[in-house]
Amino acid sequence: MRLSIITPYYNTLEYTLRLAERLQPQLTDDVEWIIVDDGCNEKALDNLKAKVIHLPNNSGGASRPRNVGLDVAKGDYIAFIDSDDMIRDDYVEKVLENLKTDIIYISWRSQVHNIVMGTPPQWNCSVWCRVYKKEIIGNIRFRDDLKKAEDWEFNQRVKPKTYTSIGSQIYFYNVGREGSLTNG
């Protein structure tokens, strides 16, 4: 398995189904999609072309679902896609073309209500704008006690020696969704 894509899920069915429309056609025998349902017990997820793990209780953040995904991931590389975000039709293709370094930085744009916004910042600490060689993650996991900035803290402990970037914007970060962890 070359790539595992991990999606933490919490009450975002409409967004997740839209993401599935883009992601499922890109999945191959070398690419797995892992959705970790954080206490919602959303049965509609079971119809997707993904390994779905239903956690019994809501953890209140993305850390625990991401850790569960990391624990079951079979890919040599790990990508994270948030359930309310969107990707381009060639996301997987572009990622697979670049699997040769410890970290692959992904170019991205913000979107509000499906409208793509201006130029992204030069640097972002989020895990969704990186693809990680699983071997450099090793036993590093997200801290369950952090509800904000867990991405930044995780990335401080991952020590890549080599990296590359994908110049074309293949990831769209959803800003301003009510109920989002980043919106409070």
Identify the function of each model-found stretch.
Residues 15-17, 40-49, 86, 90:
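Acidic helix N-cap motif at the loop->helix transition within catalytic regions
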Residues 56-73:
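Glycine-rich, basic loop-to-helix element that forms the pyrophosphate-binding segment
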Residues 86, 90-116:
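Conserved donor NDP-sugar-binding/catalytic core segment of glycosyltransferases
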